[in-house]
Amino acid sequence: MATYSSDRAFTDMVHHTLAIPKIYAHLNWQPYALSVEKATEIDMFKGIDYVFTNDGFKTVQERFREKKYQQYTDFTIRYRRDQNPLIERHQSEYYKMKAAYFVYGITNCLKEDIAPCTDFIKYAVIDLKKVYEKLDDGSILIQDNGKHFCQIVDGKMVCPVKYNTDGSSSFFPIEISFLVKLWGNEMLVAQKGFLTAD
């Protein structure tokens, strides 16, 4: 299992060497410098990793995966950490995330060998505010139903709660192609590789 520090090093490397030139530059989003204190505060309490500017501020939560996850067509949001001894930490990023956008990318390398890391196999920039609107109005449902993948049921996306094998936390997937099938491109700001028409 990867350690937090190795995960952080991988994420930082991908952000600087891939995401900035291959995603944000194409969107004309410019990095906005924050003090270390402010960056730490908004990360811990609002689930915001970075802030960009382009016709106002763009707040972003990032998640990058290694190439062994390339078969997946969804992005995941951490849900709960019920095994954490601190009750105030049971609710995970789903409950605290205030970022306006979620940037999810799958790289062409492994965490253990980042030298060949030159591109994204897939990435998506998701409008999280619109996703949360669909969660709030019941158009996207999170259910602990024992399923492995999201389904479309009666015009709604039903997403299962999944559990990490080490029991540390749960998460739920959101199928990117279902967002487009149900609501067009309104939630998808940019993408590569997640839709079959690429």
Regions found by a protein language model. Name each.
Residues M1-T59, R63-D198:
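Nucleic-acid endonuclease domains
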